[in-house]
């Protein structure tokens, strides 16, 4: 009986997924070209529910723009793959520009996670460009951070609180400064 249980445990170890990823969708649904190559992270699985901070506001804005997909809240379940992103930056459509701003916010998130020591992988998760980090490492980091600094705020993460409107204004102001510096 003990030998049978041992073999079941050994067999279950090979069935279990060896590593999970926590992914943040970049909401870039209108990018002109998303190519996946064959270097997928084989055997890896994404199990992370992405919640929006204001789901009612997102659904209200979706009713005004009929060409958008139903929701920007997605449950990212899939296999992360390395991707190439090509964006159509000459298009004057507001939706393309908004998606590029959301992609830039995702790049800021990825750089912040990289600064904290995480290896960030950009992947095509269920057709959505996502920034993925190792879920086990992320949980360990959050646990360690909350145990050491449970009530101490040692840095302000400003980029996480920027809305698309604020990103547009920040981009406009940055462009104006660049033009003034060039003159």
Curated annotation (Swiss-Prot):
Write out the transmembrane intervals. Answer: 161-181
Q: Which residues form the signal peptide?
A: 1-22
Which is a Gene Ontology cellular component entry for this protein? host cell endoplasmic reticulum membrane
Give the record's keywords alphabetically.
Answer: Glycoprotein, Host endoplasmic reticulum, Host Golgi apparatus, Host membrane, Host-virus interaction, Membrane, Secreted, Signal, Transmembrane, Transmembrane helix, Viral attachment to host cell, Viral envelope protein, Virion, Virus entry into host cell
InterPro entries from the UniProt entry:
Arteri_GP4
Q: Which residues lie on this side of the membrane: Virion surface?
A: 23-160
Q: Where, in residue ranges, is this chain on the Intravirion side?
A: 182-183
One of this protein's Pfam families, by short name? Arteri_GP4
Q: Where found?
A: Virion membrane; Host endoplasmic reticulum membrane; Host Golgi apparatus membrane; Secreted
Q: Which GO terms describe its biological process?
A: symbiont entry into host cell; virion attachment to host cell
Q: Which residues are glycosylated?
A: 37, 51, 88, 124, 134
Q: How does it sit in the membrane?
A: Single-pass type I membrane protein
Q: Note the superkingdom of the native organism.
A: Viruses
Tell me how this protein assembles: Heterotrimer of GP2a, GP3, and GP4. The GP2a-GP3-GP4 complex associates with the E protein. Interacts with glycoprotein 5. Interacts with host CD163; this interaction plays a role in virus entry into host cell.
Q: Which family is it part of?
A: Belongs to the arteriviridae GP4 protein family.
According to its UniProt entry, the function of this protein is described as: Minor envelope protein. Along with GP2a, serves as the viral attachment protein responsible for mediating interactions with CD163 thereby playing a role in virus entry into susceptible host cells.
This protein is called Glycoprotein 4
Q: Which organism is it from?
A: Porcine reproductive and respiratory syndrome virus (isolate Pig/United States/SD 01-08/2001)
């Amino acid at each position: 009986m003990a030998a049978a249980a041992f073999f079941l445990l050994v067999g279950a170890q090979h069935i279990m997924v060896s590593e999970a990823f926590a992914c943040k969708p970049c909401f870039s649904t209108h990018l002109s070209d998303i190519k996946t190559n064959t270097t997928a992270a084989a055997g890896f699985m994404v199990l992370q529910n992405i919640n929006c901070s204001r789901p009612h506001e997102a659904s209200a804005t979706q009713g005004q723009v009929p060409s958008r997909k139903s929701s920007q809240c997605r449950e990212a379940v899939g296999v992360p793959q390395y991707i190439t992103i090509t964006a159509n930056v000459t298009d004057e459509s507001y939706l393309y520009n908004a998606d590029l701003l959301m992609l830039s916010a995702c790049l800021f998130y990825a750089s912040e996670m990289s600064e904290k020591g995480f290896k960030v992988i950009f992947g095509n998760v269920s057709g959505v460009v996502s920034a993925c980090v190792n879920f086990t490492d992320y949980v360990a980091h959050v646990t360690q951070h909350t145990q050491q600094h449970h009530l101490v705020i040692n840095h302000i993460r400003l980029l996480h609180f920027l809305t698309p409107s604020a990103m547009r204004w920040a981009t406009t102001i940055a462009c104006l400064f660049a033009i003034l510096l060039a003159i």
